């Protein structure tokens, strides 16, 4: 059982882990980088042309050179436009591929996580990881990369132009460069921490909104609008405060860089007045090129400072995704597979405790369910009935003892094979936003014919409400069957189990959502379904399990009574008390 933890990796470590995801698309990166570098060179090239333009073109009134310059400007601008398109397209392609790959990888990983993981982590927070955090990765692999490569190449090319023109005036850059680098490194650490806080806040915001949307009827019924509004406002305000901290850090770093750069400009102007430098044939064109280059550096320096926050958001998002991907999926070490089991189920001294709980949910439980028999579990809420059903299918792994299926430990089966032998119909039915037919034949629609699906629906008395629908079995039922009643949804779940035809059937209060008339009809179908199968029934309504071969009364994780319906009534114990409560009011 795992709860999502936060690790603290450096930016380089995080990017090193992200690189294998980017590497398959590196051809796009290379093309984009080449285009960005060429784009930067055209900009710095235009500045470099100022020297001959001023010294030769205007200084010497060379009209032929001025005509050549006119052509060169057009060529440079054309190259700039082409390279801008290539870089934008290639980086959009790479970032889209990276985000898609990360989302697919995360989605697949979550599907194989144990049930205990979802007990410990909110759905809203996980949805935020799949949507918001994975999208943030695009910012680090595209927008930030555009700025880093292009502006970095631009600064380097401008520096080369300055040194080639007058290294004496350019030396001031080697003094301010390390100062700016230290500043950016300091701001990076601050942004990284603030970005992680922002991602956590987004998860909380999504979880809060999802909680209200899913429980909307409860909110309306109990007049909880003000409570939910207050809860959402608090989370929203917390996210706003954290966002403002990032803005403050960004706003402070930007003017500091600008001030340092302006000092460099002032230094260049001052150095130009020194006779020893003026005597080095410093022409008007040379000075204009150096000064213009330093002015031109202000924009890329500002961009590089600002992109740091964006890049750190992306790296922080990567880390939150890796936090999930580093968690272990369900333990599936079994090698045994059976084409079809008989269905003998045995619990041998089984004990189980939920993570974070002091008291065990089950204590030294032992019983055998022979093939073809129906065993029912009854007891008060929280006594451990549903836990027993979850252990058979290995949604949780036991702490002590063993559970056998046909004499083979369930731990020795592969998970997929074990679960093909078990059909579960629970109280909480989940249907998908798909057609009725696809929901009945979920995950195996190519395995069953249309006739088999119809037969299962008829056996579950579902065709009674399906046939009047305009599209019948091809009706799309909405998210979680929103267009159906509780009883109709339950009957589709029973039809799904009927179609699967597994030798072990687990009914976890399967008729709890049905009205009395529907329950009678379904009960007849369930009795037919239970023939030649091992059936474990968790029942709230005792009337549904009177014909069970044996009834186990569970109390505080232990079997306190067992026997047939008549035998347990004769004992005049816990079962008799439950029976009186239901039938005698």
From Swiss-Prot:
Q: Where does ATP bind?
A: 379-386
Topology relative to the membrane, per the entry?
Multi-pass membrane protein
Q: What GO terms are given for molecular function?
A: ABC-type oligopeptide transporter activity; ATP binding; ATP hydrolysis activity; ATPase-coupled lipid transmembrane transporter activity
TM spans (from-to): 18-38, 68-88, 142-162, 163-183, 255-275, 277-297
Which keywords does the record carry?
ATP-binding, Cell inner membrane, Cell membrane, Lipid transport, Membrane, Nucleotide-binding, Translocase, Transmembrane, Transmembrane helix, Transport
Domain ABC transmembrane type-1, chain residue ranges per copy = 30-313
NCBIfam families registered for this protein in UniProt: MsbA_lipidA, PRK11176.1
| Family to which this protein belongs | Belongs to the ABC transporter superfamily. Lipid exporter (TC 3.A.1.106) family.
- Name of the protein described by the UniProt record: ATP-dependent lipid A-core flippase
